[in-house]
Amino acid sequence: ISFEVKKGEVVGFLGPNGSGKTTTMRILTGYLPPSTGTASIAGFNTMTDSLDARRHIGYLPETVPLYTDMTVEDYLKFLGTIRGMRKEHLKRRIDSAIERVKLGDYRKSFISKLSKGYRQRTGLAQAILHEPEVLILDEPTVGIDPVQVVETRQLIKELGREQTLLLSTHILPE
């Protein structure tokens, strides 16, 4: 496939299970090499300039890798530190990410105690934590309740005004 997404655009990959949506997302995030050709994010090749490309990406994989023995806040602090965010900036960004995904009542909760929907929100919070230019969301509403689906769709619309956003789904209304 060949495509370009401009800043501020929202692009969705729609298709049945096994159609290559997740594979495409993994190629774009640098987790898988393309079988032919190249993939680039913000002008950086995802294979040869992987770290530079990843600095511009917020990624929510279909199955969010979470440290369930951490609280939501500690998890975000840990990931922000790994990303090299300055301590004074990190506190503000954690507060903002938690507010955006409506996790305020759960910031001190252990991830192991959260429902699937709130774990998904935690994953989304880590994806937006560093204010990336490009958000890549793989099946962002899978397995969450109908109210959270509506809230997540609304947040995606808001984020799409600010960032380039790619998402995958096999649900047509998405």
Regions found by a protein language model. Name each.
Residues 29:
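Helix-to-loop junction immediately C-terminal to a conserved catalytic motif
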Residues 37-48, 52-53:
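Conserved ABC transporter NBD signature motif
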Residues 77, 81, 88-106:
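Conserved ABC ATPase "signature" region
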Residues 124:
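Hydrophobic anchor residue at the start of the ABC signature
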Residues 129-133, 162:
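A short, proline-enriched helix->beta-strand linker immediately N-terminal to the Walker B motif
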Residues 135-139, 144:
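Catalytic Walker B motif of ABC-type/P-loop ATPase nucleotide-binding domains
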Residues 149-162:
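Helical segment within the ABC ATPase nucleotide-binding domain
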